[in-house]
Amino acid sequence: MLKYCLIPILVAGALLPGKAFAWDEEGHRIIALIADHYLDPAVKQKVDAMLAADKDTLTQHDIASEAVWADAHRDLDRKKAQQRLAVTDSWHSVMLELDHPDMKSACTEPTLPAGTPASQGPADCAVDKVNQFAAELSSKTASAGEKLLALKYLLNLVADLHQPLYVSDDHNDGGEQTLVSGGGGEPGTLRHYWDSEFIDYLGDDPKPIADDIADGVRQSKTFDKMSKGTPSDWTLEAFGLAKEHAYGKLPAKRPDGSYELPPDYVTDSIETIRLQLARAGVRLAAILNHSLGAKG
């Protein structure tokens, strides 16, 4: 069992949607740092060397910072032309309808045209892109530049598969149209709470959080079990958490249509997020070890 250290005050204080860390920032950094614990030594050396050679200035070039690169790249022109947003936004999620999930419809597994790199090829969901980038990272023919892009996208997209609100939709734009509050705090969206607020209660510094979670995985000896499966399996697992907990345990609506999250919902959500961070870190490491191992 993973170690949980929940501060009692977390269910008494207000959960305010003020910080913009989101899974895009703090969560991604935590997951990358967890993965760093489990990289084979030779693979870690390759990862560090590839990132050190990165000339892009959007982020720093340590593994935690590079885990945010795909989001920063996507959002560069969000308020202008939105060309990057239009091309890559669907790469970060899998929109499975809560009442009738259909993986084949959500992820159609398009084939990359011959000679087309994964960074330019078609895909309609995160599962497809993870599979494409993992294959490219292990390729003997892909250029160094394309392999670097594959690594940077994997650092981000594997994490996205494990955020329950990124792989589910209840006709509410993935939780963006559902307003909630906790402990009497100001309303925010359900997606924001799962993106950011619940993670914030684990702490402010991603490294000690990642170290603690990785230590919990070691003590529980669950790495091998966690690392099994495919991106599709992991997506359906996260979808189950969305259906059973994120949506399934919401209280009755208030008269204004929003939800007041009870203390047990908040506590359980933080524990669920912690588990998903662990799973994502372990599985990211497994993908990188496979793609950049003896055959990578």
Annotate each language-model stretch with its function.
Residues 4-5, 25:
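Absolute N-terminal positional cue centered near the fourth residue
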Residues 5-15:
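Bacterial N-terminal signal peptides
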Residues 17-19:
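N-terminal signal peptide c-region/cleavage motif recognized by signal peptidases
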Residues 21-157, 164-296:
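N-terminal, motif-rich segments that launch catalysis or mediate targeting to/interaction with membranes
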